Each structure stands twice: as C-alpha cells, then as structure tokens.
C-alpha cells in the first residue's frame, strides 16, 4: 500500500525529513495523512479542535526548537533531531496499521500477497477478461484492484462469511459495536434479502405478524409468502401531494389491535403476546420517521419481536435530534420485545449497491422461549446468502462501520444536516413554485429565519404537528413523527395545501424529474406532486447549488411556457407526433387534468386506509402456491373486479404492494391501476414501472394492463 502523507504547517513543509510526501495543512482534508506536524502558533489557531472534530485520531506533533508545554491533543514535541524524526515515522506507521477496519485490512494484505490461484472465480484476477478487446475495456474501466479482490472462499485467510469466522466475524462484531447492536450480520443481496432472513428466522405458518401496510414488498415475500404468517394490517397515511406517511396513532392502541386479531385469528386474541413479530418501517421512503420508543412502549408488550425496517434510514443514531427514533439506542428489559433492525447501507450510508446489514438486539430476552438464537437466525441467513460472495461488498460494509465510528460519524452527518437546511433556505429564497416539505412557520417565525445551527439541533423544526395544514397527513399524534432532515422533499404546484384539494393548474413532479434528468441531475423518486432527493455526507455546496439553479430555471420555463421540444427534447423526439407544437404548460395541464379526473390523490390515500383495504379471502402463501401451480388466468385489470389476486401489484418506486396475493381486486386499488393505464396511453414517455401487472398492446394499438387472478 502506498504510504500516506504527513500534513504540516506551511512553514515546516520544506524542513521535515521524511520519505513520505509532506503537504501543507491547508491542502488536505486529513483523510490522506498519517500524522500532523504543527507549530506553537498553530496550536492556538484552532487546528487542534479541527483535528479532534474529524474523529480520525491522528498523531499530532508540535515542532519547536524551544521548550514548550505540551498542549492537550498533541502527541509529542519534536525539534528536528534524528531520533524524533524516527518517532514521527513510527507514529505514522502505527496509524497506518490501525486505521483500517478488520476485514478490509485483511483483504488488502491478502491482495498484496499476489497468490497464484487455481480456484474460482475463473477470470483469475482479471486475466481472462484481458484476452479479448471487450474484456480488456471492462478490466481497464473498473481497475485492477476490483478484480484482484474478487476471490474464492477456498482460501481461509479471510475467514468465512457464511458461518462468521475470522476477520469476517471481527468485522461484524466491530459494526455491532458502532451501531449499538448485540450482533450484526452483513448481507450482500440487499435489504430485500435481509428482511427475508429475519422473517424466515422468526415466522411460521399460523403465526401472527403485525404488519405496517407501508412495508416494502420484501416483507410480504418473507413474512407472508415464504413463511405463511397471518397478517394484521396497520393502516397508514398518504397526503395529497403523494408522500408516504406513517401508521395512524390509533393503531397503536391495545384494544384496537386485539379486535383486529379477533377478525383473523380469534383464538389468539387474548394471548399475552399474540404477535410473534411486528414489522414497522422506521422511516418511510418519503422521510416520515417514527419515534421508536413510542412504538415499543405502546405495542412492544404484545410482540415477541419487532423488526424495524430501516432501509431508508440507519444514520439516525449519529444525529442527536433523531436519536429518539433509534431502536438500537434504547434501554430495554426482559419485558420488552426483541429488536431487529435492517439497514440498506447502500441507500444513504457508505456502501456499494446491495450492501445491507441486520442488527440484532435481544440479549435482554436471552433465556426466554421467544428468544431467537444465533444458530436459528444464521440458518435463515444461509438460505438467502450466496456461497460465492463478492468480497468488495463485504469490505464496503466493514469500511462503512469504520467511517461511522465515534466522532467521525457524528461530524459527517451534522454537516449533511446543515447542508440540507441551507439548501432548503436557498430554494425558499429562489423558487416560487417548488416548496421544501417542512413547517413554514414555527412559533410564529418563518422556518428559514432561524439560524441553521438552531434548525439542525431541534426536532421541532421538522415535526409533524397533528392537523397542521402544510403536511396534510391525518391521524397523527403529537411527537409521533418528524421529517427526516436528510430527505430533501419538495412539493410541486397542483394541490391547495390549505384544503388538500386540486388547484386549477399543476406541475406533476414527474415532468420536473424528467427535466432534471435531461440536465444531468438524478432525483431519487417522484410521485404525483412530490419529489425526493436523498442527502448524504457525500453532498457538496456546489452540487446542491446546481440543483437549486436548475429548479429555478425550470420555474422560468413554466413562466415562459417554453416549447416542450426545448425543455424535454428526449421525450419530444421520441414521440414527435404526439407532442407536436406542445408547450410545457400544456403538458403540465393535461397530466394534472388526468390526476383530477381520476382523483388519483384520493385513490392513493384510500388504498392504505383500512376501510378501503382489499378483502382478504386467502392466505398469501396459498394464493402464491396456486400461481406457481398455474391455477390462474391473465385478465384485464378492468375486468378483474371480484377476482382473487395471484400476484402482488405495485408501482416501483416505492415498492409498496397495493394488492397482496389472496386479496380481491376492486375498489380503490383497481381504479388506481386503471388511472395508471389511462396515463400510459394518454401521455407516452411518462409511464411508471409496474410490477405484478403487465402492459400489453391490444389490436387497437392501445396498451392495457393485465394481472393474474385465480381461476
């Protein structure tokens, strides 16, 4: 490995004797240095506080030719003699030996050994790829080390990723310590797999699972289709803009839940703990974050375990104002439920795509019959894990834990939160149509008029006050939910926030999203009149300034009613006949009118309200089995009313099922998909991705949606 640099005061750069490159303090962010040398004047300038705030624990030396008192935070004083240069080098070497986390450290050392391998993978460190022009290009594009680090588990030096031995075990123990879990398991095929591991380890046919209707489809797959458990659904909120909200407060009432049990499994209604598992989204896709303490205090005594699906959060414990939402920071006792937390590290933490982790916090119920031991969980883990893991994915999870250790993690997320606040302020200052989804006024003062440091430290500035017009969510209790400060959520015109009704003109968010992509900016998702941008410590002022500028530019196009060919050339050129001579406002109006004609915002809301849930007539596992046996037929969604769904159906994103296998098509769900069908035909170029329903072109050239139902 290449030696790291030494950072030094500019006046010392030329005086330091080292084989290492010496860089000035102002020319580094300290991620590439192994030691720091400062002057006495530097020690009084704030550099020591800056170094402490990094959380990197760098050795710091004070250079002085005179006797000085050793300041706090300084390792030693040096004056330039040879022995002291050796001490500096020794400290730098020791830092290099210790700053990497366990698995990644072992991996880099193993790669540097350059072993000759006759084991898989067959590309043999990339050599196979380099024997063909396409392969050579592939190799050069990704770089040498990714191929050298892709190796077989035939060599045991790196430990075992399936039974958790060696440095692999050390890495997961380290992550558990950082994230305050009892055990942590690294998962290399996403939180979809992580959720299935947990649900397969805990649930069997006949078990009751308390089920957030907002849950990602992977929870349906693991808990309902694979395990065959019986769900008790919790209704959830949608607001008129299309944002995904949280579970209604009344759903956390014990008597209410016992009545729901009487409807599906009356024999279990009076059991002390009727639910083997509750599955709750700790944070929704659209940034509604739960208070974990409230969840456990209200329903925890009814559940053996609670799985907090934290795919869209995971960083809450590193942000002080979000700490109450972290299940892993709670003090639990023998009467509380066991806790599982699944996190999509690749979403907003530092991980390659597909990296996920399972945190297990249940030592407080060890010895009880409901306790899930490691061996049982690992059995489920191995059901879903590959025997040929991609080691760079595992290493990324290891490095992610190291990044979040101690002050480093807190600093990085504090900077992210403050940058997000500054960006919201910039949008409020420059834009008239697009509004950040935050309380417009707090304690009689405009949100943006508070200092950023105040906004970043008090959850009041992100809280959903029950009944407040600005957010439009119903059924919330005080202090139940707040807006994730690391989700930059914007609303677009089309909804009157005071009434929740449609306005005469609107700008559907998908049109804005297309414009941004045309101009090199990729939002995370959009829906109806809402759009989401994920914020992570990777962001920069320049990047977010570009976004704000592009939002303002699009607003100008709206005001000018620019030609569609100019604003969305890709869509226009693909469908020139359909959109000939169209202007931007004309397209916005047509799409908005489509939403209004189907009342899509209310359909979307109704799908997740209990009174509008599709009727359940069959266990989801049984319906899925019938589908696999071919006991189904493909029918038009228009004709599916009263038929039993064989597949779950959803738009993606967000990946939340609207109808579950074993439920009956009809009502709001059917009308919602018919609205989507109308949009596919009326507005080509803006079709959503649909799963569980199929678009087929009929003889008249129109696209129709079909779905499988039981015969």
What are these regions (language model features)?
Residues 39, 48-52, 56-57, 177, ...:
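Conserved PLP-enzyme active-site core in the AAT-like
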Residues 3-6, 184, 209, 278:
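Conserved hydrophobic helix-helix packing surfaces used for dimerization/oligomerization
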Residues 134-226, 232:
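Long, structured ligand/cofactor-binding scaffold of large enzymes
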Residues 2-4, 12-19, 28-40, 45, ...:
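Non-catalytic terminal extensions of PLP-dependent enzymes
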Residues 185, 278-281, 531-536:
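Short glycine-rich or small-residue beta-strand-to-loop segments that form or flank ligand, phosphate
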Residues 23, 192, 285-286, 540:
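Short strand->helix junction
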Residues 190-193, 238-241, 530-532, 567-568:
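Short amphipathic alpha-helical segments embedded in low-complexity Lys/Glu-rich regions
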Residues 184-185, 342, 520-524:
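A short linear hydrophobic-aromatic micro-motif
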């Amino acid at each position: 490995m290449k030696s790291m640099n030494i950072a030094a005061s500019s006046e010392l750069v030329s005086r330091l004797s080292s084989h290492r490159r010496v860089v000035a303090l102002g020319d580094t962010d300290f991620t590439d240095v192994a030691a720091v040398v400062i002057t006495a004047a530097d020690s009084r300038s704030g550099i020591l506080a800056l170094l402490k705030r990094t959380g990197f624990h760098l050795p710091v030396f004070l250079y002085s030719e005179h006797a000085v008192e050793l300041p706090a935070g300084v390792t030693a004083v040096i004056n330039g003699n040879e022995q002291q240069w050796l001490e500096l080098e020794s400290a730098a070497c020791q830092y290099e030996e210790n700053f990497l986390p366990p698995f990644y450290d072992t991996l880099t050392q193993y790669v540097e050994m350059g072993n000759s391998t006759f084991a898989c993978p067959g590309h043999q460190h990339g050599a196979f790829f380099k024997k063909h022009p396409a392969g050579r290009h592939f190799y050069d594009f990704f770089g040498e080390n990714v191929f050298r680090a892709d190796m077989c588990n035939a060599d045991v030096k790196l430990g075992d990723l399936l039974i958790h031995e060696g440095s692999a075990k050390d890495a997961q123990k380290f992550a558990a310590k950082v994230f305050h879990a009892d055990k942590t398991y690294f998962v290399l095929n996403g939180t979809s797999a992580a959720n299935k591991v947990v649900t397969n380890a805990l649930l069997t046919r006949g078990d009751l699972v308390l089920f957030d209707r907002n849950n990602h489809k992977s929870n349906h797959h693991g808990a309902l289709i694979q395990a065959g458990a019986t769900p008790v659904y919790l209704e959830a909120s949608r607001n008129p803009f299309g944002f995904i909200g949280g579970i209604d407060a009344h759903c956390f009432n014990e008597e209410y839940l016992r009545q729901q049990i009487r409807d599906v499994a009356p024999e279990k209604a009076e059991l002390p703990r009727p639910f083997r598992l509750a599955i709750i989204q700790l944070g929704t896709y659209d940034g509604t974050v739960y208070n974990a303490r409230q969840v456990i205090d209200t329903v925890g005594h009814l559940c053996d375990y609670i799985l907090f699906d934290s795919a869209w959060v995971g960083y809450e414990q590193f942000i002080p104002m979000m700490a109450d939402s972290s299940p892993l920071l709670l003090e639990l006792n023998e009467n509380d439920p066991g806790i599982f937390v699944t996190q999509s590290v690749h979403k907003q933490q530092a991980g390659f795509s597909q990296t996920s982790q399972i945190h297990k916090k249940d030592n407080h119920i060890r010895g009880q019959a409901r306790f899930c031991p490691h061996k049982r969980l690992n059995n489920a883990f191995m059901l879903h894990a590959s025997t040929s893991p991609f080691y760079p994915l595992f290493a990324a999870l290891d490095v992610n834990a190291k990044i979040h250790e101690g002050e480093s993690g807190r600093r990085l997320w504090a900077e992210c939160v403050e940058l997000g606040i500054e960006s919201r302020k910039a949008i409020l200052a420059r834009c008239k149509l697009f509004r950040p989804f935050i309380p417009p006024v707090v304690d009689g003062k405009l949100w943006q008029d508070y200092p950023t440091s105040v906004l970043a430290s008090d959850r009041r500035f992100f809280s959903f006050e029950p009944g407040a017009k600005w957010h439009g969510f119903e059924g919330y209790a005080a202090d139940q939910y707040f807006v994730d400060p690391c989700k930059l959520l914007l609303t677009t015109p089309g909804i009157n926030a005071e009434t929740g009704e449609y306005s005469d003109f609107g700008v559907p968010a998908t049109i804005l999203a297309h414009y941004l992509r045309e101009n090199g900016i990729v939002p995370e998702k959009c829906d109806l009149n809402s759009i989401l941008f994920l914020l992570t410590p990777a962001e920069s002022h320049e990047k977010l300034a570009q976004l704000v500028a592009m939002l303002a530019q699009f607003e100008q196009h709206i005001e000018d009613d620019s030609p569609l060919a100019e604003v969305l050339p890709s869509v226009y050129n693909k469908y020139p006949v359909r959109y000939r001579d169209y202007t931007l406002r004309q397209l916005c109006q047509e799409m908005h009118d489509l939403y209004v004609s189907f009342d899509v915002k209310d359909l979307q809301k109704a799908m997740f309200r209990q009174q509008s849930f599709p009727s359940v007539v069959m266990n989801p596992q049984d319906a899925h089995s019938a589908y696999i046996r071919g006991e189904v037929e493909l029918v038009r969604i228009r004709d599916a009313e009263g038929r039993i769904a064989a597949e779950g159906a959803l738009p993606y994103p967000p990946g939340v099922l609207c109808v579950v296998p074993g439920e009956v098509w009809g009502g709001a769900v059917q009308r919602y998909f018919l609205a989507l069908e109308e949009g596919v035909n009326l507005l080509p170029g803006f079709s959503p991705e649909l799963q569980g329903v199929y678009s087929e072109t009929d003889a008249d050239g129109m696209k129709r949606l079909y779905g499988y139902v039981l015969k």
